[in-house]
Amino acid sequence: MCIRDRVKKLRWNPSVVHCHGWFSAVVPIYLKHMFADDPVFRDVKIAVSLYDDAFPGELDAGFRAKVEHEGVQDENLKILDNSSYQNLMRFVMDYADGIVLASEGVDAALAEYARRSGKPVLEYQAPEAEGFDNYNKFYEEL
């Protein structure tokens, strides 16, 4: 059973879905396109955390086609023709409502892209910082 089905079964309507790292990259576009009319996810806000977790090279050449095959039709998918880490994370940020710079080593160009996006950005929080309060304030901004 996938998380989407479990959320529905529990009759829980999330207010925020927080995606961590590149591995969760398709979640924002699925929520914004495929589940946009679903009452459970219609008003959900999406936060994306960026880490120093770049992968070398590119994802499979058919990655864009796989996303399209799932029913996503969007002109922004063309950035995935070159599915490098940087392009994938730019794509993810375009569908997020807020962005977290979750480690000190986040790619500088991606951090700048986040800051210029006009979306709420939570800068890196050192482990000793009052992180929970800062995250709560960030979520309230979404």
Question: Which ranges hold each PLM region?
Answer:
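Catalytic cores of nucleotide-sugar-dependent glycosyltransferases that transfer UDP/GDP/TDP-activated
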Residues: 1-142
